[in-house]
Structures are given as C-alpha cells and as structure tokens.
Amino acid sequence: MEEAYRQARKRGEQGRRRAISQSEHPYLTDLDSLVAQLPCGQRENIGLRDIPLEMVVGTVTKGRQSAFSCNFMPLLPWNTEFARKWSNLYDIQISEGYRDPIIVTEFMHRFYVQEGNKRVSVLKFLDAPTVSAKVTRLYPGKWDSVESRLYGEFCAFWYVCPLYEIEFSREGSYEMLAKMLGQDLVEKWPQKKVDYLRHTFLLFKRAYLRAGGDHLDITPADAMLVYLNVYNQDRLLDTPTDIVVNRLCKIWRELVIAGKNDEDKVDLVEAPSVDEEESPAKSTSGMLNFFMGKTVYSAANPLRIAFIHEFPCATSSWDSLHDQGRQYLDEHFGGIVRTEAFEDCHDPDVFYAAVETAVKHGANVIFSTSHRLMEYTLRAAVEYPRVRFLNCSIGLPHQSVRSYFGKMYEAKFLLGALAASMADNHRIGYHASVFASGALSEINAFAIGASLLDPRAQIILTWGDVPAGGLAEAMCREGVSVMTGVDMSKSLEDPTAYGLHRLVDGKVAGIAMPVWNWGRYYELIVRSLLHGTWDETADDQQVRAVNYWYGMSSGVIDIRYAPGLPYQTRKLVQLLRNGIVEGSINPFGGELHSQDGVVQIEGFPPLPSTQIVEMNWLADNVVGTIPQLDDEPKVRAL
C-alpha cells in the first residue's frame, strides 16, 4: 500500500518537474478558472457513462488542484490524511473494484472531476482505460472558433454514435468517417455498428501506438482516417496487428503530412526548372546526344511510363487528350522514353491489375489521369514505393503521390473578358458541372475578366450536367446571349458542350475554348526525371506533398479562337494573354470584392497560390451560390 503510493508520488513529481521545464502548468487544470475566461452556454445531463481516463484532465474547482500533478499523480507526503485515503482507495480497487461512479463535467471533449479525484488518480496509476462517471456536459457560449466548431461536430457524432474515444483535429472528419461506414450524423447508428467502430478503433489505436504514433501531431482517430483512405476495403478487426503496424510504416509520411497546418502540407511547383525548360529539339546533335551525360536512361534502358485512364479514349475526350499527350512523349523523346496505356480502369480491381501489369513491364512512372483515380493511386503508391506515381488533380496533400494540374483560371480570365465584349445585355452565363478544388478560382477569374470590359456585367452561375445539345436551351432559359460551358465534353460527339458560345438565331455558335496541352505538360515532368531534378523538387527533411501547377507561361494552358472572330477582339485578348504570360497581369491582384464584401483593398499583391486553389468565395458580380456538400453529389478535388 505504502509502496504503491510512493511510486505514484514519484510519477507525480516527475510529471510536475517535466511540466515546469516545458513552461507548462505543473498542477491539474481547474474548470472554474478555465470557463471564467470563456463564454459558456447551457448544461446538459448526459447520465451515467464509461469515459476514457486519458480524457479526464482536471478538477472542477481549485480545492484539490495542488494535491495532484498535471498527470493526476499525487504530490502530498506519505504521512498525510490524503495519502492514507488514496492508499485505502488503492486497496479497494485491487481487491474488489469501485462500485460508485465519479461525478464529472464535460467541456470541449475533456472531463473535469467534481467528485472522485483520488479514485481517478488511483485508476490512472493502474493504467485503467475507463471509469464510470455521471456526466454533465457544458456547452461553449460561442461556436466561432475552430475548436468550438470541432466540438460541435463531435457532439453531432456523439448523439448518433456515443463514443468519446473518437477525437479528430480536422473539421469534416466525423462526417467523412460516417460515410466510410455507410452512416450519417442524423440517424442513430445501429448498436452493432457502434460496437464495431469501438472495437476497430481500439485495435487500430494499439497498433498505431506500437508503431510510434504518439510522436506524431495527430490523434489516433486522425491516423485511422488516413489509414482507411488507403486500405478502405480491409476490415481492421480481421487484420493481424503486425500487418496493421507494417501498413502504418508504409504510409508514415502520409501521417506526418496529416499533422501539418494546411499551409505547410503542399509545395505548389508553379514553373519548371531551367533544365526542364531547355528544349532538346534545339540540339544540333539530336535527341539522344542532348541527354547524353545528363540521364541514366537510354534507348537500351528507357524510362518506362504507364498511363492509366478512367474511361476508354474512344468515348472520353478527357482521356483522349491525355493519351495524345502520352503519344507525344513517345515521338518527342526518340526512344529514351517508352509508354503504354491502360484504358477503362474506373473499377478498382481493373485499376490494380493495370498497375501490377505496368510494374511487371518495368514501369518507372505511372500517371493516373483522373482525380477520381486518386484513392486507387494512393494505395498503389504505398504498395510499390519504388515506382513514382502522379495523379491529375490539385489540392490533395499526399506525399506518396504527386499531383499535377493547370492554372485554368488564367484561360477563364481571358474568356470572361471576351464574353463581356460580345454580350448583348450585361448578362453572361457560366455553367459548371462539378464543384471542385480550383472551380471557384475559375469562376471568379472569369467574372473579374468580364468586369474589366463591362463593369455592369453579371455572371449567371449554374451547376449540373447539360444534356447533349442542350446548351442553347440553357442559354434561353437563363436569358443570356453568351455562355461558357464545361471545360471538356464527356462525349466526343458533342463539341458544343464546352467552351465559350453565343446564341445566334436560336443556334449555338462557338467563340473560343480553353485548351489543355498535355503533351507539353508531360514533357516538362518527364524532363525532370531524365535530368535527375525530380528529387530536388521535394525536401526529404520537410515531408510535404508536391503539386505541379503550371499555367500559360509554361505552355500547358491556352485558348483557341473560333474562325471568324474579329481581329480587334483577338488583339484585345492577346494583350491580356501576354500580360499573364509575362506576369504583369494577375486576376487576383489588387482590389477584390466577394458577394460578402471586400476581400482585399487596392494596392495589395496577388493572392497567394494556396488561397487561389482553396478559394471559398464568389466575386460580387456573380449571381449564384456555392453548392453545399450534401446538395452537390459531384463535389470533388480536381
């Protein structure tokens, strides 16, 4: 009995000294002092619950605060009444266990003891996982901070799945977990589903801590969400712990990135290096000699690249354009690079079979050409760490897979100016099929471009699919004479479904369209591999995701005019285009206004690229709204 108390007190002193050395409070936090500085809301009686002891962090009042270290271990000497009571409670717990619950207040997903501090101390000393408690929940008075919003999401989760152990540090994670399990945050979950999640989480947490997860800046629940994003088809309860630990080691860099602030997760590479820009076509000694001494690859030992397309190239214009880029590589690099393509790989089994075949064929690099293939690509990248994987998307922070996309907002800025120069009534239509990362920057750049030529221009924004040949009907319905459709039609047979058009005598006539030059884009990425500059892009000491985000200045984005466009109009757009390429014009520089007010005032530099990718507002001359996640089934990251 005495020995147990002395050991507990020793741990208490160690915890107190450690806290002092780290400039932290050495004693228990008291809730009264905490809420005195914060506005609080109503209280709710939660009732009798088993709560995780690791979430019991303090007392309600200051009364016993200095009797315990910050780790809840005792600090008072052995020859005190406090020590004797603690020891008696220790004996009871060892011999028969406690029968009466403690009384706690829950505040912001943590528990503060009103009655039963010494029992908590004994149980923590014995490494007990939970304690029975009568719980009263104290709500925050305001919900305008990240912490309070996260707690609000937890409360919504708790009411349908009453598990305290699941704690996330990122907004939206509870809803994501619910969707993974086929549930929502509205209807109460079946008890079997609650029990399954509890057991699954506890199993995962043990494996996560065994792998060293306590050294990361994420919660075990955060880590489980990352794990399930990669191994989502595996039931954790059926997976041996050793395998889970091994998988965690494979995705360790993904876990590290998950703990970073949003601004530290991704390196946006916005321009190729000088070596990548240098053109082998200008070499008088030929393609092979141009790379001689600069690369380990040759005609006898080529760089092998596989392209995995979501749909057949014969029916999908998006996949067809990417495959044209693939064919350009074969022609351009004269045997140093050899490619192969796998089509119609939207099914996961077909995708993984394609990856396996590509690896057997010696693929050094694998491109997946649709954002919808990122989930499969990530898992494949984890399984084949020696193969370089890239996915056509932007804004997805994965260290195992590099992303690449284009600054389409630059082309949309030009199309907006062009649309305003040809609109009849200040009303211009903008149709978007999906809400995606980058979609709002494209809409706003279009609106800003239009406002340069017509300050009264209004952009009528609509979302959803347009039936083949239905653009004219959509334009009449919205009362616009000029409208831009989606960037790429699903069908090669419907060329009027995308680009900028005007309505003439009830028929749609093309004006201009944005152009992707995927051959150029793939050429720039492949040069980094041939020149050996690929690894220079990423700093191994700073684990970050790499997203290539090239634009007009790199030659990967442009616009194409329809025949018959007046030369004066082409000249105007060309002036704006030159400004973008040279860097003297940026749609998001200077004064900016959203539907809700001023974004930034005159004289400010252009918005940082990360803010452009993650833009969450609409320009003040846009008539329309941003779809909610629940309302828009096609929400995605590009």
Where are these regions (language model features)?
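An alpha-beta-alpha
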Residues: R326, L414-A457, D540-P563
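Extracytoplasmic "Venus flytrap"
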Residues: A306-Q324, L329, F342-P348, A436-L440
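Short, charged/polar connector segments at secondary-structure boundaries
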Residues: M1-K118, F125, R170-G182, P190, ...
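Periplasmic-binding protein-like
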Residues: G362-H371, L390-C392, V480-S489, V508-W516, ...
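Flexible loop/hinge segments that line or gate small-molecule binding clefts
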Residues: V382-F405
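Segments of small-molecule ligand-sensing domains
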Residues: G532-T537, Q541-L638
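Glycine- and acidic-residue-rich phosphate-binding/metal-coordinating active-site segment common to enzymes
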Residues: F107, Q114-K179
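Hydrophobic alpha-helical segments within soluble ligand-binding/sensing domains
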Residues: Y404-H426, V515-E536
